[in-house]
A protein has these predicted regions:
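Polyanion-binding surface elements
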Residues: 1-19, 23-24, 46, 52-56
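Residue-level signal for beta-strand positions within conserved beta-sheet cores that form or flank
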Residues: 2, 28, 38
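Short, solvent-exposed alpha-helical "recognition" segments
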Residues: 26-32
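Short Lys/Arg-enriched helix C-cap and helix-to-coil transition segments
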Residues: 33-39
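C-terminal secondary-structure termini that scaffold catalytic or DNA-interacting sites
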Residues: 56-62
């Protein structure tokens, strides 16, 4: 399991910080895990899965 910090999440998704946190508040994006104190990171595989779900939705009829 690999943990990634916010800059990597932003690079992977193309989202900005505020968009990531807005989606988390809506339960539409993986939540980070707390490391030490205020430091947090995301599970890379969960972020990849979220991206793959967005790609799959693109191909679904509306």
């Amino acid at each position: 399991m690999r943990l990634i910090r916010l800059p990597q999440v932003k690079d992977m998704t193309g989202l900005g910080r505020s968009s990531v946190y807005k989606l988390m508040a809506e339960n539409s994006f993986p939540k980070p895990v707390t490391l030490i104190g205020r430091a947090s990171a995301w599970v890379e595989s969960e972020v990849i899965e979220w991206i793959e779900e967005r790609v799959a939705e693109r191909g679904s009829p509306s």
